[in-house]
Amino acid sequence: MKTLGFIGVGELALYTIKGLRRGGYDGAILLSPRNRDKAALLQRKFDCQVQVDNQAVVANSDFVVISTRPEDCLETLAALRFRPGQVLISVVAGIDIARLGGVLNENLKIVRAMPVSSAEAAASPTLIYPEHDYVRELFAYCGNAICVDREDHFNQGSIIACVYSWFFALFEALTQATQGPRLPADVAAELVMGMAKGAAELALASRDRSPGQIAESIATDGTFSKLGLDLLKTEGAFEPWRKACKLLEQQLAEND
């Protein structure tokens, strides 16, 4: 099994490594020493090895994950000396392969990946570009690896990684709307999140129908489901979601 090194040990590295280990990945994982508290936690609980500096991580790894903050990424990479045959995996948002490659001392294979925090629960739908067999296998430990063959597809897909965080706010709003004297908050929360999980699993298992068609097949005339769905449509409840996605799309275009 290949040796995996992480440059940058923040929250993203933390939940990705937790997911790798909990998913069954047992290869060596090397860490940069920058964030001492998180690095020490990962060394103690998730069988990682803290190196003396970033260059030591690169020197001793086959695959190197760059997981710094975007503003630090290129400067950090430019200071490192890679060797032929290594693979760089970037989980840094907003920096394309051309810019990453432009600061490297070697012409490396570069793969972009976008795990989300559900990786910690081995449930991240991780977007990957370009397809790479080992990188796909790696992120499958954290959930599901989804490969695309164009970088603009990857960039557009990154919007959905942001939508992921909005779901939590929706879960909170629905829990607050349904809890009360007739339903305890913890039961409401479990039902809301369980229904969301069930709906997603049904939609994934029913690719012959769109999610909208599934909704219409359930929310039929005379049902409470239709009563509520019709109100949501009348009130334009879904339009702000479209606008929020368009806002992020515009921001991505400005950053290109």
Ranges and model annotations:
Residues 99-109, 124-206, 247, 251-255:
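Internal alpha-helical scaffold of NAD(P)-dependent oxidoreductase catalytic cores
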Residues 193, 197-256:
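NAD(P)-dependent Rossmann-like dehydrogenase/reductase catalytic/cofactor-binding core
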Residues 29, 39, 57, 73, ...:
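Small-residue helix-packing motif on alpha-helices
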